């Protein structure tokens, strides 16, 4: 592979002063990014080994040693290491190689084309998570080419099975290859940069996440003939319980990450929005602000408390038979420090119906619940500075409402920070966002995300040239 990198090398200059010819690097970077997107690694079944084979071929051409490890030969992970002087513990940079499934009939641009159309790259996984995978891969290549002198090893990992099968990915890596990936700090997915009206607005660094703690509502009542309706109908009881839970405003509780997040939004947002975020902190105005967010800004609203969403309902088997039981499956996303049994008790009081039971269990039961990564460390400050250098916008810590594999790493004491590419705020509502049927990323965002990864990695690793 041709070396498409020009440097002004000076050991006395900090990383920010190094003169990388990004125009040349970007050409190569885009080709590698498109190649990753063109690999079908939908999960299930995964087939992440296809991605690993591509990355290994690129690394071999660069003289970067790597090893492939797997629990299943078709679902491999790859680990590579750029050595430092060992004065600090390693930095892990990673991305997951699998993507969620597609419905090909709903895509107007083929989902594995990596096509460049109108300033965007289209394809499944362009945001989640081949953007991070590509940026970490290219950063590893640039570290090797420049011969950077590092204070810590930089470990690159392409990880399988993040989209629901972590026993092939992070779970397997932690249990069987911890010595190969152990690190002080990690850069992975989940943050990003919000763009409004064509301009970057603010950036986020994910430092903690909510935890899946599912439950079921089980309503019971007498069975009988549908021609003789009964007041004790299980479906009627279940419906009333679902309505009460859906309209419930659980207690708001902020942690260091979410408090800082909303305080900063109260400083940088347009006047009306800013006042609403400030109102959240005012006991006299908080309820009205929360109600607005519940209706208009569900992501913000979910960050305020443990959330409950009824997503599956089952009841009855024949139209003329009153069923004796009806159930609803709930997606509960708990705050990191939530006492989930106490929360179930609150739900029971809200429902207030002896015919409806709250049954604990479901998704995320075995998932660790680590404390948030701190937002005052030197590593966080260096990452914050990298975002400011690349995008020139305020940086906010973020609590992810979904789940990532960083939870397992945080549980092992790793300082994990989630980063991500720039995206237009309106893309989600327009059907172009993460997991959508027309997932896309700005070409500019591809290039800037690599620059962000490079600046963050070289700063945290103490690179000297």
Q: Where do the PLM segments sit?
A:
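Structural recognition of the beta-strand scaffold that forms the well-ordered cores
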Residues: 32-33, 38, 67-68, 79, ...
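Stable alpha-helical elements in mature extracytoplasmic
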Residues: 25-33, 47-51, 55, 129-132, ...
């Amino acid at each position: 592979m041709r070396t498409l990198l020009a440097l002004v090398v000076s050991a006395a200059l900090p990383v920010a002063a190094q003169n990388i010819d990004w125009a040349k690097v970007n050409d190569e970077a885009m080709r590698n990014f498109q190649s990753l997107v063109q690999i079908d690694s939908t999960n299930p079944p995964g087939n992440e080994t296809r991605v690993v084979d591509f990355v290994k071929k690129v690394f071999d051409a660069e003289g970067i040693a790597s090893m492939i490890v797997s629990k299943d030969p078709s679902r491999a992970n790859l680990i590579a290491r750029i050595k430092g002087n060992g004065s600090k513990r390693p930095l892990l940079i990673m991305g997951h190689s699998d993507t969620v499934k597609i419905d090909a009939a709903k895509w107007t641009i083929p989902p594995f084309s990596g096509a460049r159309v109108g300033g965007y790259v289209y394809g499944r996984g362009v945001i989640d998570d081949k953007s991070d995978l590509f940026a970490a891969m290219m950063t590893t290549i640039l570290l090797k080419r420049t011969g950077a002198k590092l204070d810590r090893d930089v470990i690159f990992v392409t990880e399988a099975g993040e989209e629901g099968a972590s026993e092939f990915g992070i779970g397997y890596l932690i249990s069987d290859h911890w010595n190969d990936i152990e690190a002080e700090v990690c850069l992975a997915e989940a943050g990003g940069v919000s763009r409004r009206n064509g301009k970057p607005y603010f950036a986020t660094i994910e430092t903690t996440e909510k935890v899946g703690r599912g439950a079921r509502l089980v309503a019971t009542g007498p069975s009988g003939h549908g021609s003789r309706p009964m007041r004790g109908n299980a479906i009627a009881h279940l419906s009333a319980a679902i309505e009460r839970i859906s309209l419930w405003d659980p207690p708001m509780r902020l942690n260091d990450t979410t408090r800082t997040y909303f305080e900063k939004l109260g400083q940088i947002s347009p006047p009306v929005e800013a006042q609403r975020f400030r109102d959240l902190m005012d006991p006299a105005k908080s309820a009205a602000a929360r109600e607005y967010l519940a209706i208009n800004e569900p992501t913000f609203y979910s960050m305020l408390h443990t959330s409950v969403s009824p997503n599956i309902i089952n009841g009855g088997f024949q139209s003329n038979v009153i069923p004796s039981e009806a159930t609803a499956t709930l997606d509960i996303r708990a705050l990191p420090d939530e006492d989930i049994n106490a929360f179930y008790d609150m739900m029971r009081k809200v429902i207030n119906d002896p015919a409806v039971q709250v049954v604990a269990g479901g998704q995320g039961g075995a998932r660790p619940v680590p404390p948030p990564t701190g937002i005052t460390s030197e590593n966080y400050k260096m990452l914050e500075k990298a975002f400011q250098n690349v995008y020139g916008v305020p940086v906010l810590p973020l609590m992810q409402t979904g789940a990532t594999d960083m939870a397992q790493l945080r549980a092992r004491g790793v300082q994990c920070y989630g980063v991500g590419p720039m995206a237009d705020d309106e893309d989600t509502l327009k059907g172009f966002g993460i997991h959508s049927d027309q997932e896309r990323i700005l070409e500019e965002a591809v290039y800037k995300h690599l620059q962000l990864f490079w600046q963050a990695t070289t700063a945290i690793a103490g690179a000297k040239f």
